[in-house]
Amino acid sequence: MKRTVISSSNAYASKRSRLDIEHDFEQYHSLNKKYYPRPITRTGANQFNNKSRAKPMEIVEKLQKKQKTSFENVSTVMHWFRNDLRLYDNVGLYKSVALFQQLRQKNAKAKLYAVYVINEDDWRAHMDSGWKLMFIMGALKNLQQSLAELHIPLLLWEFHTPKSTLSNSKEFVEFFKEKCMNVSSGTGTIITANIEYQTDELYRDIRLLENEDHRLQLKYYHDSCIVAPGLITTDRGTNYSVFTPWYKKWVLYVNNYKKSTSEICHLHIIEPLKYNETFELKPFQYSLPDEFLQYIPKSKWCLPDVSEEAALSRLKDFLGTKSSKYNNEKDMLYLGGTSGLSVYVTTGRISTRLIVNQAFQSCNGQIMSKALKDNSSTQNFIKEVAWRDFYRHCMCNWPYTSMGMPYRLDTLDIKWENNPVAFEKWCTGNTGIPIVDAIMRKLLYTGYINNRSRMITASFLSKNLLIDWRWGERWFMKHLIDGDSSSNVGGWGFCSSTGIDAQPYFRVFNMDIQAKKYDPQMIFVKQWVPELISSENKRPENYPKPLVDLKHSRERALKVYKDAM
């Protein structure tokens, strides 16, 4: 297996350290065969479409309906934290507290716990980034302190097996059951958790729901979407595959269930009580292995504040000082025109319901204008939250999109060039196209780029370089601090014309126009490509020649796409 050293003389980084890190680029070329030895095929994907195979979300809902809550012989209630690492407005945690309070009326010795489960194989298989994992570990420590004030212990369980094993396995079910029984001394336990919509995670929950040990009662809740998947359908009862009509119905649905004139979403707030009479805070004994951090420059291990308070503060600051300029500044590469909330949303440090509630108060009671083109900056900010819901709804309806397959199965016929050298140069910001290189270097050094940056580089990889969009999708997941699988797959599908509500195949971003529009003074480019600082019209000798001619590569892409589609 080829391993390449990433080297950069980036001026931004050189003040601290060079980025000289061994990296295996081949891991991005396909799904990890260790975890997915038999990846889904086109035929298998179509089984979801023709209803010959049940969708995992439908199975979860069907099994849930069979569940009945019983407090008989139950001594413990436990909330299983996943991507919902917060106390404020957490549906599953709120339900857990409510169930515990009911149980306490029957069993005065009942206990309330919280748990987070680590499976490093899940991280490897899903290519979770070291940036994000560092943030999560910091958030867990902060969450443990916050829960301690409520006398709720946060347990940290590590799932390991001799073989590489995902959590959607019978081994995990046995592990989870044993851990729960250890906590409850063999008596009944009620576990609450918020649903994760990726296929692997849904199959994990299906296995747990199918577990026949009646001492375990699992209660799953919708939490990460403003509107739960399945509630917004066409007049024929099918799922939307185009955003705009879906978005209009989303707005209608949210307005119909508006809580009050000042709040549009119902929030789930737990009381600040001491829930267990006795409590002992036990520090976590887990540290992230080096393998998850080795491609991140140590000098850049400077993460955003991981606390819930920091997320709330960012939201307040954005709505108070920046949201009015969102339409004009969100795409600019050299400005911080976005909210900076994405990592907090991805890890669940803040709920999207709270975000929409706060933003709603700045919209004069209207979260969408009659004509979308007239949306205010804050209304368009809310629209971005809706996009996140949309991609989650779509992933539930077309599960194969989280299994390494495109929404448009006909695009599997595209004859990608898949030049591994070109891919490495794209990854490391050495394509010879300044705007692309600046964006990719920033991603390497910071773990974050804005949405416009993602669109520019995704279009260049899939159209100009004719490299399978899934290579880039995996690279982004491995390097983004806010990597979210449904949004990442959705965004790459849009730019590569292979996904849901994608741009037409003949739309290829013009890199020169993108640079002039979103970095007109080359402030961003010169920050991240210092080779160009002193150059005027000449290409410096220490800066690579363009990998492709933009005009000719566009023409090539149009032909290849047209032949396949």
Range-by-range predicted roles:
Residues 2-258, 263, 441, 487, ...:
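Trp/Phe/Arg-rich N-terminal binding region typifying the photolyase-homology
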Residues 8-36, 72-73, 237-410, 519-565:
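Glycine/tryptophan-enriched, flexible segments
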Residues 79-81, 116, 136, 140-143, ...:
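Long, contiguous hydrophobic alpha-helical segments, chiefly transmembrane helices and signal peptides
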Residues 92, 139, 143, 311-318, ...:
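Alpha-helical packing segments of well-folded alpha/beta enzyme cores
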Residues 126, 130, 134, 302-305, ...:
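Charge-dense, low-complexity intrinsically disordered segments
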Residues 196, 497, 531-533:
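Short, loop-centered acidic/histidine patches that primarily coordinate divalent metals
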Residues 340-526:
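Active-site-proximal binding-pocket segments
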